[in-house]
Amino acid sequence: MTKTPSPPPSLNELKAIAETTLKTLPDELAHHITDVVIRISDFPDPKIERDMGLRSPFDLLGLYQGVSLDRKSVCDPTPDVDMIFLYRRPILDYWCETGEDLAHVIRHVLIHEIGHHFGLSDADMEWIEKEGQVPGFTCA
């Protein structure tokens, strides 16, 4: 007897996982992202693909759009809402290719994009993952 494959997680199911992840973030982090909107879509839109020079829409798992906290100013308010996009199909492909837990993949992508909200570069975040600490910060 063969198993009937279950359908891939829906946009709403990924949103629920992302919302659960947000609830588990430390208060110090969560406090600064209350106004950030989380959106789930199947793929980045074609303009994003072109602007980022993607070879494939599967090359991008998530994206932060907005003005990072290190560049915000009360003298120059931005009218746009800060948003984090999670792209369902690329995330699901990555999940299938790696065999990692889906919630772990979503958490990793979400925290990576939150890092951009804080003004961290990809290089900063790679360093943090490798070293386990934020450059320039020490614990007393």
Question: Where does each model-flagged region fall?
Answer:
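Catalytic glutamate of the conserved HExxH
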Residues: 109, 113-117
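Active-site rim/adjacent substrate-binding subdomains
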Residues: 1-105, 117, 121-126, 132-140
